[in-house]
């Protein structure tokens, strides 16, 4: 493996190196959700989910799509999805293999 690939792999693991972030990513392997839906599914506070989602979007592992525009009374509502299928495959594969260790 070349140096650039090792750096990319390091950045990937650095990004998922948080228990709640990893829970959110695994949740997103099962479908696309709003932050409120993720918070409900994982029994987490929406602000905590939102903070982690912003981080994951900034790292380009998760994408956010506006489904309801911001108004005077409410923030915009987004649906969150894993950026690509390969990340989903990696997460599912890691989860399956971890029990064999």
Regions found by a protein language model. Give the residues of each.
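Beta-hairpin "wing" of winged helix-turn-helix
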Residues: 59-74
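Short capping segments at the starts of secondary-structure elements
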Residues: 19, 30-37
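A short acidic, leucine-rich amphipathic alpha-helix
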Residues: 37-41, 56
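Residues within the DNA-recognition helix of helix-turn-helix
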Residues: 52
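Conserved segment of winged-helix/HTH DNA-binding domains
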Residues: 70-101
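Short alpha-helical segments that sit at the start of domains
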Residues: 1-22
């Amino acid at each position: 493996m070349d140096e650039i690939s090792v750096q990319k792999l390091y950045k990937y693991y650095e990004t998922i190196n948080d228990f709640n972030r990893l829970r959110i990513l695994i949740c997103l392997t099962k479908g696309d959700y709003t932050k409120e839906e993720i918070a409900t599914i994982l029994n987490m506070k929406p602000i905590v989910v939102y903070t982690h989602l912003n981080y994951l979007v900034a790292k380009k592992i998760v994408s956010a799509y506006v489904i309801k525009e911001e108004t005077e009374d409410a923030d915009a509502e987004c649906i969150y999805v894993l950026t690509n299928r390969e990340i989903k495959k990696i997460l599912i594969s890691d989860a399956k293999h971890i029990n064999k260790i």
